[in-house]
Amino acid sequence: MRRRLPAFLTLASIALAGVGLVGCSSEGASPSECSPVDIAAVREALPDSLAKAKLDPHSTDEDEHSFSVLYRAQDKEQVSLLGTKYEAEGSPVCPDDPNEAAQRYLELLHDDLDAQNADQQRPANEYSPFEFTAADRRFYCSAWPVEESVSTTCVTTVGDVALNYYLHRDGRDSAAEQQRMEDIGAELAPALQDLD
């Protein structure tokens, strides 16, 4: 089964431009201003495995502006990873501040999740933010309780691409889930180092 990118990924790109967190066009920009990258290059740079989870080649969904992949492990752990171009009015743009853009992107993910909860008459999530650095790359993350387990997501910026990953397992210890997300980020960061 092919995974479809959630609609909020495109919304997040447009909203970032609307609040002024993205600034330079990907055409003719100097390396000091922004580093546009090919979305396919980001996808191809991903490792074949993340700890025990192996990349599922049948899970990939990709177009010129976005992609999604899924890593699966035998113990039912899954990591879904989504990449999407920052855009403004249909054109690729790079963040003026990649860290601020990643933080804002995370806020927009929260907004989207809370809107989904509201549509289903459920309360808003109680997010616990955390952040970390791996191989000089900053990751902005959140953990929140869902029934008896803990959900987590992290965002980083690679050139003009927002890279977002989720951990899917029945983890109940927030500290353990946070550590697992940091371990995943530590594996991803070196693979992305030469892209931006």
Regions found by a protein language model. Give the residues of each.
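N-terminal start and proteolytic maturation junction detector
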Residues: 13-18
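C-terminal motif of bacterial Sec signal peptides marking the signal peptidase cleavage site
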Residues: 19-23
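A small/polar (G/S/T-enriched), proline-flanked helix-loop surface module common
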Residues: 28-196
